[in-house]
Amino acid sequence: HQINVFRTYVGGGFGGKSDPFPHEMCAAILARKAGRPVRITFDREEVYWINRGRHPSRIEMNLHADSEGRISGIETDALIDGGAFASFGHVTTYYNGVLHTAPYEIGAFHYTGARVWTNKPASGAMRGHGAVNSRCAVETGLDDLAEQLSVDPITLRLANLLPPHSATITGFRVTSIGMRECLERVKEASGWNDKFRKMPLGKGIGIGCGFFISGSGLPIHWDPNKFPHATVHLKIDMDGGVTIHTGAADIGQGSDTVVAQSVAEVLGLPLDMIRVRSQETDTSPVDLGSYS
């Protein structure tokens, strides 16, 4: 190996560190040529040039429901603006579809999506990419449906929530789900019945639902080869302790601590005999990334 990358504790995810950026490569190449450390800094305007923003989206959606508001199907066509470089465009297009329907129980779902190249800064994995825009489309669509059916928007959502221990139509497993209790408490605490459609011109009250998925134990590449998302190597030390080599980057989620605790529990060792090395690529096995 000619290059050994040392990872520092920079903190924070939110998609901003998911892409490899040209200036990172430039800094490494310049450092090798100069034999000195190289640092690249940007002013705020330059940050917008080189970083990644959210994908502007045009989403067309048809909701199918009976007279009582039970949703039988959703048809969605999404077109997203990925800018001039690929970045996470294909992944965001995929997420727009698979994250589209939760937390609702949908009878049928059809999705088409496309990412277009434009002469603009690239869009990427910015804060829940692929979920935020589609959630906006679904929630505003539900409001329109409630208006057409003369149904209360909260009542409509309560009628279509997924039950616990079920699955979304796109294949995500649902264990516990507190959305019903949450909506009922919000309705009561907000004074919904006294405010909805009863506030003066220019003021109003609305509702929208969101959700998140936990990817722990789920490889990002869903393929038949079943490759692991992460691997660790354990080395038994002379003092009886264990050194863990992992490529998982601790960006605040506590992976260094959790890995150490897991190994300590399985091997029956005290935590102070566990050492974690996750800072350099020479000694760390492959890990597909830590991101929010």
Language-model segments: which ranges?
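Structural alpha/beta core scaffold segments of enzyme domains
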Residues: 1-292
